[in-house]
């Protein structure tokens, strides 16, 4: 059992949420996560975002499609990769979410104990 939740597990949790909310493609997810966590001193590495997305595809949670970024194919050549749930991906995502919740609760317990024992906070 790990001491704290793994970074990739943490990122996968957020990526699943973003796909549920249809919040864009890989690079957009990266930028959104950076903006969301920057105030907390955490900038998720690009490599970890794409590894996490790749794992979710390999695990059958997500599949990807490609499309042109703009609306005019005569001038828009940049292709983006969009992520979607597979047929049983939402169920797999929910199971994954429950597993990560258990780990998060354990980690929070450890952190709260350390905070209480060393700083007197409860």
Q: Each predicted region: which residue ranges?
A:
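Short, locally clustered residues in the helix-turn-helix/winged-helix DNA-binding domain
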Residues: 17-21, 34, 54
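Short capping segments at the starts of secondary-structure elements
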Residues: 10, 18-28
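Short, leucine-enriched amphipathic alpha-helices that occur as contiguous helical runs
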Residues: 8-12, 46
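Beta-hairpin "wing" of winged helix-turn-helix
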Residues: 57-76, 84
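Basic amphipathic alpha-helical segments that dock to polyanions
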Residues: 49-59
């Amino acid at each position: 059992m790990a001491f704290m939740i793994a970074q990739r597990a943490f990122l996968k949790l957020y990526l699943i949420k973003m796909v549920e909310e249809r919040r864009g493609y890989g690079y957009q997810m990266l930028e959104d996560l950076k903006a969301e966590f920057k105030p907390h001193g955490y900038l998720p590495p690009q490599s970890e975002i794409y590894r996490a997305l790749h794992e979710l595809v390999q695990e059958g949670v997500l599949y990807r499609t490609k499309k042109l970024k703009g609306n005019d194919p005569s001038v828009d050549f940049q292709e983006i990769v969009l992520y979607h749930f597979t047929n049983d991906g939402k169920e797999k995502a929910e199971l994954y979410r429950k597993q990560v919740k258990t780990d998060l609760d354990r980690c929070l317990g450890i952190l709260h104990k350390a905070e209480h024992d060393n700083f007197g906070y409860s």
